[in-house]
Amino acid sequence: MIVGRKEEIAELEKLYYSDRPEFVAVYGRRRVGKTFLIKQALKDRITFQHTGVSPVDQDSDKSRMKVQLESFYYALLNQGLEGYKQPKSWMEAFFQLEQLLQHLDTGERQVVFIDELPWMDTPRSGFLPAFENFWNGWCSGRDNMMLIVCGSATSWILSNLSRNKGGLYGRLTAEVKLSPFTLRECEEYFEHTQIQMSQYDILQSYMVFGGIPYYISYFQKGLSFEQNVDKILFGSKPRLRDEFNRLFAAIFNNPEDSKKVVRLLATRHAGFTREEISNATGIPLGGGLTNTLAALVESDFVMRYHPYG
């Protein structure tokens, strides 16, 4: 069962039953439930699905491209591809996907779901031009095609899909931004999982975990709010051990700079000016800080505001 997300589910259903090709981007911060939403909303209706490999713990750019291509090829094999060798380029890989989809085509809606798409776009891999060609040269001419892409690296989705000025300009037919649970949705979640929580404890859980479904999914029946928090964040083997470092490494191109900014902002309730951030972190005021702040804002980690007076 999906808690909340009624508008997002209705949007996906509407797009599924449209009579034209659809290119949908679903984005939002990591752990917010994007993959779960898509798989539950379109259960048993996905023709092909693949998830990019996390860049965390990967080495050189060349090695990362090889790993991504390898993983994509195995997904093709697992879902019915026959008679093709492992692709050496993304252009070849998407050609193989086209062949598989043609083989599986019954005339009904075909849903292609590519999760964590930004991870697949490794440096100098030629991924984006090949992906553009896949949509522009093949998918867009098939009325039964529904391509759904998903990613936690919101800045990548916005820069390369929503605001693309090249081959994918204006190609998205829908965008779905998935936000954390509201306070009411947190309450619904605890009711659904039969975890007894007072109104005050639900409010505290929201303040600590920010309405992120993945985090509150670790709450256990029979434990108090304090016991659950201790088990998730502090105990001898906390569930979210090293989450901070792994989260930033998976989302941002410059995780160390992003962490510096977040740590600094956490020290003052009223926030900092760009100049103050630059002076305190050593990140140059030019493109470096601008890009870092833009990525953090777009990923809902920080917010920009203009003080009055």
Q: Residues of each region from the PLM?
A:
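Phosphate-binding site recognition
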Residues: 1-309
